[in-house]
Amino acid sequence: MPLRLIKKKRLCRFNPASFLTTGDQIAGTSDWPKLNMTANPEASKHTEKANMAVPHHVAITMDGNGRWAESRGLDVSEGHHAGFENLQRIVADFANRGVAYLTLFAFSTENWDRPESEVNGILELAIAVIAHEAEQLNENGVRIKHLGRVDRLSPELREELELAVKKTENNTGLTLAIAFDYGGRAEIMNAAKELIAEGTPLEEIDESKFAEHLYTADMPDVDLLIRTGGDFRISNFLLWQTAYSELYFSEIMWPDFYGEHVDLAFESFNERKRRFGKRI
């Protein structure tokens, strides 16, 4: 029976137990596989495949859930369900590849303007997934972070996020940052406001000091930014942290972005010459 998580009228049916799919539904897994606990915090790790370097910090704009569903004659909510299932695949895959930080753009500050039924469905689904998955992520050594505002989240979602962050704060495996009610411009503006409120002398403000007031204060800059779904834009995501990121855009919709599509993204990353503004 679907779990009732929000007292108001339900707008999205979801059984959280179904998120832990079988090996037939998610290729090669049954529940959560044992994740790699040895992500190198100092440098990129190399995979066995062609001695491929793995980016230290990967950020993903998970786009295309709605179009994936519509192309199959399904309700948009089913696309979001499929997208969350792929999240499980990707987290396990990236951890096992040696990625140290994975940031997922789950819900933007602008997404509140979508139809109310879709927004409520996403919020309810997020509550169910976080509530049901946090323990297994914790057992696998994953550290969960939340990037974004909390004041507009429902009490249920805020509580689940805070519990997940607290439960996993001392883990040393993959850091999974969930950008929910996140906007890059708002993040930068809030950092500036905090510095002003603290009375920080102007001469003490530099890039390092400013970065301490971002949501990602204890995280490195993004090495590889992936966007699925066929659009070629950043969409207000990690504007500060992607200053020198490599960008990879895929036409594949998010629910189908795994396996060989991840291989292609990492292969593309390995073909880049990262100069960081210098002449090499």
Feature names for model-found ranges:
Residues P2-L5, F19-L20, D31-I280:
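Flexible, compositionally biased loop and terminal segments
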Residues K8-K9, I26:
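Polybasic, lysine-rich low-complexity intrinsically disordered segments
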